[in-house]
Amino acid sequence: MSTKEQVNELFTQTVDDWARFYEDPKPAKMSSQNLVSRRRFAIEMIEAKLPKGSKILDVGCGTGHLAAELARRGYDTWGTDLSQGMVDYAREHYNRDRFQVADIEKIPFPDNFFDGIVCLGVMEYLVTDVNALREMWRVLKPGGHAVVTTPSSICPFFYIDRGLIRVRFAVRPLTGAVRRMLGGEQRPAQPFPKVQHRRYRKGNWVKLMRSHGLELEDWACHSWGCYGLERFFPQGAFCRASDRFARNGLLNWVASDQLSCVRAIK
């Protein structure tokens, strides 16, 4: 199975989960709170750069919540996603004519069509960035803006989380055996997730975008905390700190996600 097929399968299986994340205005879990923060930062960047009525493409639109929110705020929005399940959900709940299945490496719109692009939680699942950056630059108008997120490669919490996940999957056969001995309910076995999830260092990422005609104009980092241990820590405190220090250069290395707002140079 190719990388794109794996990603498509993963997100098609979790459509309802993602819908619940975005529909909950006050999510309890830290991971969900950080998704809400990411969306808020992206909207703030778009509103700071583009007037109402601008044409916006949400690449990797998922269930369509962000595109719908931007439309509610007065933008002319479209959405594309690799997952048929995600697009079906967006069409059912929002504008049917504005969502379609498409690959970020082959965006189905003409050159210089959009004033803005939002691309949240997409780049890390690609094999390479080159084609995606080239396509975003192509469909942006000269001077158009894109807001793109990438996970940070230096966030310490990421490595803690990965270790905890591996431990959890390693001990699952043992916990299953104990549960059987005690006559408890059996849970279906789940394989360790194999979908790739690349991470980025700011300097290298900025250089790569610049080499594809995308000049950095704004930058923020967010999402603090270890998801694997979130039940043991005050989640609200982590999220408040993440929001407060989103543009603090000394503390950005702690955050797990990076948002870059870039302008298309043509």
Give the role of each language-model region.
Residues 1-50, 53-60, 147-177:
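Conserved class I S-adenosyl-L-methionine
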Residues 63-106:
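Class I SAM-dependent methyltransferase SAM/SAH-binding core
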Residues 130-142:
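A short glycine-rich, Lys/Arg-flanked "PGG" loop and its adjoining helix->strand segment in the class I
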